[in-house]
Every structure is written in C-alpha cells, then in structure tokens.
C-alpha cells in the first residue's frame, strides 16, 4: 500500500516520468459498487497493486426481489453522483425470498493490464452475470488528480452525508418490516401496542425526510423498543410451529 501510494504521488508530481511508470502499476482510483441510498461500497482501494481481486456478499432489500442491479463505480467520494460510472448490468434469476435472505457474491478482479472483470453470482443457484471494463480508459492524469483533491476537500461533508443516507435506508428497511409484521401477525398485538407502534413508525417516517441522522437513529431505536414485546411473540409463535410434531430427540 505504501509503495503504491509513493508511485501514485510521483506520477501526480513528476510529469517527466509518466512514460516510464504506468498508472496500471497500481489502482489510481478506488473501484466499488452502488448500494442502497445511492452510496458507494468500495471493493478495491486506491493504490492497490495489480493484479488484484476482492469479493463481497450482498443481499436483496425487498421481499421477492428476483434481480440485482450492479453499478460499477470509480472514485473516492461516498455518493454515487460524485463518482465515475464505469458499467451497469443486472443479475436476474434470483429465487424469490424474503428480504435479506438471498446471497449474491460480487467479485472484482483486475489483471496485470488493468482490465477489470466484475462477476455477480447468486450463491444458491449459481446464476452468474459478468462484465469487463478498462477503468483507465478515457481518464487523464489531471482528471485523476482533480478527483483525489476533490475527495479531500469534501471528506467531512461526505462522511456526514453517508451517515444520513445510511440512516434513511435503515429507516426504510425497519418501516417495511414493521408494516409486514403488523399485517401478518396483527392478531398477536395486545392493548395499546398497535397505537404505540404506529406512532413510533410515523415518527421514523417523518424524521427520515429531514437531515438529522442522529434523530433518525434515535427514532428507529424507539420503534424497536416499542415493538419488542410484539416481535418476541411473533418469534415464539414461529418457533412453536417449527417444533410442533417433533420430539426433542430429533433436535
């Protein structure tokens, strides 16, 4: 990592040597994917020596989701709109499952020539989709330097924006789950619980429209607390259904 940083710094400051040392010796800008909320998840960090590879497992956000959009990005910023788009494709054929159950491994592999191969594989079926791209194509040294300087200038704001969007995504997930549980297991609610949960849900929904990530986080926590007894009854009912008709020896 230190060697890669030294090479990159030299390239940005010493024009005379740019013909001798290629940008392809290291990854000049981080490579990643778009995730929920328009955020960038970096898989290969800037200044990684090549060839190199990295993989990460992602999942679905909604029940019954059968496709996963893969948006490949380049850059150091935290938001999609502030990074360079390299490629897009969709992995189709994911078996319908509850949200969060599917497992899709996305692998980035950069060869010695700087060619990036991106492969997405749904783990239960083996369904695979891939694409190749050359990240350095059409990118000048000056543009790379400007992107790096831009990321430094906006580092603090980017962190705050990322935290806000992460909390908004979590708020959306929690609200979808709460609505699902109320719809499917409302009969398990006790006196006053529905009103308390719906009030907490309204609070989360309203704060998620604002810009206070801490307030959103606190509202999500309050919803979790208000729904805890109800959720425990839902889980206990599910466990009883699973063990019904089975002896202890079977487990």
What are the language-model segments listed below?
Residues 1-251:
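Oxyanion-binding/catalytic loops of NTP- or PPi-dependent enzymes
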